[in-house]
């Protein structure tokens, strides 16, 4: 008996379009399904990346929702450092974790962008993600390209109910339709099982 795929992970090199793909899929399905979650948006000033913002998926696609700085090169004096960025742990708590906890109760599709080194610095983030993955919800998540180097991430990606897609410059134009189709089929299956 095959396991129903309801968790879709997208990985790929930085800048390849993971967040864009997730936003496009969420936007295409937003009026048909209850969608909640968050994205991590790169912020540039004068062509140079200065940090990342966390925002609700609804905010990311032009509707209302919370946002805050996840990390910045100079804005924060305290907090853990990853590369040149200081990470704002309170944004992970106030936006990512809070949204995921709400989404488990209310959403059909839960968007998690990204499961990566910055987000994993918060001790509650991984247990919250595991709670989401162990729910019956459909999940569309991006995972850091180096997930294989972290046993915690590798365990998430290798679940029998998960499908991993690696986004590249060569396949990214076709991958949107493939991911959208798979997510929509999982959502239809979820809806049928709840009827």
What are these model-predicted stretches?
Residues 27-81:
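N-terminal phosphate/diphosphate-binding loop that engages ATP/GTP or pyrophosphate donors
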Residues 77-131:
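Phosphate-binding/switch loop-helix module in NTP-utilizing enzymes
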Residues 13:
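P-loop (Walker A) phosphate-binding loop of NTP-binding proteins
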Residues 7:
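Walker A (P-loop) ATP-phosphate-binding motif of ABC ATPase nucleotide-binding domains
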Residues 10:
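Hydrophobic anchor at the beta1->P-loop junction of P-loop NTPases
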Residues 18:
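Conserved lysine of the Walker
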Residues 21, 25:
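Hydrophobic positions on the alpha1 helix immediately C-terminal to the Walker A/P-loop
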